Amino acid sequence: MRVPNEVCFNILSYLEADELRCKSTVCTSWRNFIIPTLWEKVVFQNEAQLNNFFDTLQYSKDVSYYFRYLRKLNCSRVRKFLTDKHLMLMTLATGISRLNLSGCTRISEPLIGKLLYQNLNLVTINFSNIFSLPANILEYISDNCPNLKALNIGNCGLVEDTGMVQIIKRCPYLNRLIIPNCRKLTDVSLQILSEKEDLIELDISGCEGFHNADTLSRLVSRNRGLKELSMDGCTELSHFITFLNLNCELDAMRALSLNNLPDLKDSDIELITCKFSKLNSLFLSKCIGLTDSSLLSLTKLSQSLTTLHLGHCYEITDIGVQCLLKSCKNITYIDFGGCLRLSDIAVSAIAKLPYLQRVGLVKCICLTDLSVILLSGSFSRNLERVHLSYCIGLTAKSVSYLMYNCKTLKHLSVTGINSILCTELRSFSRPIPDGINPSQVPVFCAFTKVEIDLFREFIRNRI
């Protein structure tokens, strides 16, 4: 009995890439199904993969045949190695819809332009962290990518208003725009952007040229479907919420990042909880003007809030944390790093969160071993990541207890705690990672799941 091709193809779709490559030589019909499947998405994991790919294909007679099926190209993981030599080969593709060249700083403008010209169906482009990306690349995009929906040019410091305005005007389907630290952009771009009505995600963090809070308010009001807004460090836009219409409720907003806005007030948080009543994630790190009153306001988000970052909000106390966490029981990630007034009392409330997966308490210098014991308790069944670095009141005894008893723990950092550095516990620390601040090297101490498992085995053998 001959199995229909449709059934064969359905079975083949469950196979891994290596198995598919072997099966592609079985017959022509299988090959015709497998080749497009293998080539739909190309992601390079390391330099060896990139060079092997290039060396294999550069002299292949079928190279154009293969590239016609390429739809998603991701070179971000080989950003240090990708050059024009490699990118020239990629320009044979004509059907790419998703392009990620994040951090690929060794490629030139002409080849980027050619790749854009060859692929008119691009819907997602990521050129972030190409620090010297020429400003006129935006003109290439606006001229050649009419179907663009998502653009990420974060940290591309040469981008200017002229190109950004063209993108906004000529790409009518654009609904995700990520432009952090594009410091040459001004209110001209913000004004044009405020005329759109279908934005889903917007990141303008670090865009120091944006000054008009009223314009941002109009943008938010018009884009009722906006789900994510990040504006870290945009100090002159801090009070945009006060310009919103009193009757304007924006229930679509799920994630709001307002880090490093020292002028943000408790009254602003009160308005935020009223306007964005279904927020899941709220980031308020270094908003030093906030007090326990803000935490009281956040209790209005009790049903929706799952992620909250309040690091370095120095006026927050145990009372505020207790009040907040009595209501907000669905939190999975909470960070109070640098909140110097917090004590074991606050951690006792944190430890009772039934779905807690990640907690940050770095530099909470008033904590004692009791806090760590509490985190190790019966509610820790989901706890995966704990950050306790520079909590100088802790000892190796409590940290060892946490590592042994919290079975779901995958990461624990206790850097800078002298009472731990001088014990055998430190010998289980993971290797010091590349790029770490030199001042942290002598006091580094952290554990991943591998080291935690080794420690548990060590303890079991000693019992």
Curated annotation (Swiss-Prot):
It comes from Schizosaccharomyces pombe (strain 972 / ATCC 24843) (Fission yeast). One of its GO terms (molecular function) is ubiquitin-like ligase-substrate adaptor activity. LRR repeats lie at residues 145-170, 171-196, 198-220, 225-247, 249-271, 278-299, 304-326, 328-353, 354-378, 380-405. Part of a SCF E3 ubiquitin ligase complex. Interacts with skp1. PANTHER family: PARTNER OF PAIRED, ISOFORM B-RELATED. The keyword Repeat applies. It holds the Pfam family F-box-like. One of its GO terms (biological process) is SCF-dependent proteasomal ubiquitin-dependent protein catabolic process. It comes from the Eukaryota. GO terms for cellular component: cytoplasm; mitochondrion; ubiquitin ligase complex. InterPro entries: F-box-like_dom_sf, F-box_dom, Leu-rich_rpt, Leu-rich_rpt_Cys-con_subtyp, LRR_dom_sf. Residues 1-42 form the F-box domain. Keywords: Leucine-rich repeat, Mitochondrion, Repeat, Ubl conjugation pathway. This is SCF E3 ubiquitin ligase complex F-box protein pof2. The keyword Mitochondrion applies. Involved in substrate recognition in ubiquitin-dependent degradation. It is found in: Mitochondrion.
